[in-house]
C-alpha cells in the first residue's frame, strides 16, 4: 500500500491560524477523506530541512489511482492536484510501496 508524504512550510504570521486549523478543522477533514476515499492519516510531523523547519503529513493511500479520483472532486481538488504533481519531486513527496511495520501508530 503506498504512502504519500507531503512537505509544507508555515510562514511567519500564519502560525496561530495554522494551529487553529490543525486542532479543530483538520481532524474533521481527515475523517471525511478517510470515509470517502479510504485514505488514512499516518501522522503530522515537524521536520528539520536544511536551515528551516518544515512540516510533513503522511497518508496511507489505498492505491496510486486514488489521487486521480480525488483530483476529480472539486471539494478536495487542490490538495489532490498538489499531491499528484509532487509524485516525481523527491523534495516534496515520497511514495513507499509497502506499509511500515506495526511499530508505527496512528495518532488522531
What is the role of each PLM region?
Residues 1-77, 87-108:
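Short S/T/G/P-rich N-terminal loop/turn motif that feeds into the first structured element of a domain
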Residues 80-84:
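C-terminal structural segments of small proteins and small subunits
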